[in-house]
Curated annotation (Swiss-Prot):
GO terms for molecular function: DNA-binding transcription factor activity; transcription cis-regulatory region binding. One of its GO terms (biological process) is negative regulation of DNA-templated transcription initiation. Keywords: Cytoplasm, DNA-binding, Repeat, Transcription, Transcription regulation. InterPro entries: MraZ (IPR003444), MraZ_C (IPR035644), MraZ_dom (IPR020603), MraZ_N (IPR035642), MraZ_sf (IPR038619), SpoVT-AbrB_dom (IPR007159), SpoVT-AbrB_sf (IPR037914). The gene is mraZ. Belongs to the MraZ family. CDD domains: MraZ_C (cd16321), MraZ_N (cd16320). It is found in: Cytoplasm, Nucleoid. One of its GO terms (cellular component) is cytoplasm. SUPFAM superfamilies: AbrB/MazE/MraZ-like (SSF89447). Gene3D superfamilies: Transcriptional regulator MraZ domain. This is Transcriptional regulator MraZ. Residues 9-55, 81-124 form the SpoVT-AbrB domain. Forms oligomers.
Length: 146
């Protein structure tokens, strides 16, 4: 698997059919890594996770291995997963169900998160970020040097 890392934020807009254009800076990596094959699913924080298909396969295997006590989360991650493809216009189609789950209407943000991307409603992400910034630094970051 090619070495890649998604980072940065792109402000985008959904079109009337629920499609979003994949930015050029991510498109080349997605095409070379996954042949334009992506999987989208719900994220616990109210956005969508966008995985290149090979990365999704690893994530899916981890979810499938969860114990019965996590069956609700398995249902959320696997039951809402949708396979999509980047089309000839460099767009990916977001299903109506996933758009509704993440509150995606028009203005969206595509955020690089290392091995995958997150797709957020722009206003929802701004509120989520403001809430994070109001909290004290978590213990796990106390020794992190800036």
């Amino acid at each position: 698997m090619a070495d890649f890392h998604f980072q940065g934020t792109s402000a985008l807009a959904l079109d009337a059919k629920g499609r979003v254009t994949v930015p050029a800076r991510h498109r080349e990596s997605l095409v070379s890594l996954a042949g334009s094959q992506l999987t989208l699913t719900k994220h616990p924080e109210g956005c969508l996770m966008v995985f290149p298909r090979p990365v999704w396969e690893g994530f899916r295997a981890k979810v499938e291995a969860l114990p019965m006590a996590a069956s609700g989360w398995k249902r959320i991650f696997l039951g809402s997963a949708m396979d999509v493809e980047i089309d000839s216009g460099s767009r990916m189609l977001i299903s109506p169900e996933l758009r509704a789950a993440a509150g995606l209407v028009h203005d969206v943000l595509l955020i690089g998160m290392g091995n995958h991307l997150e797709l957020w409603d722009a206003q929802r992400q701004a509120s989520a970020e403001a809430a994070v910034l109001q909290q004290p630094m978590p213990d796990v970051l106390q020794d992190f040097s800036f």
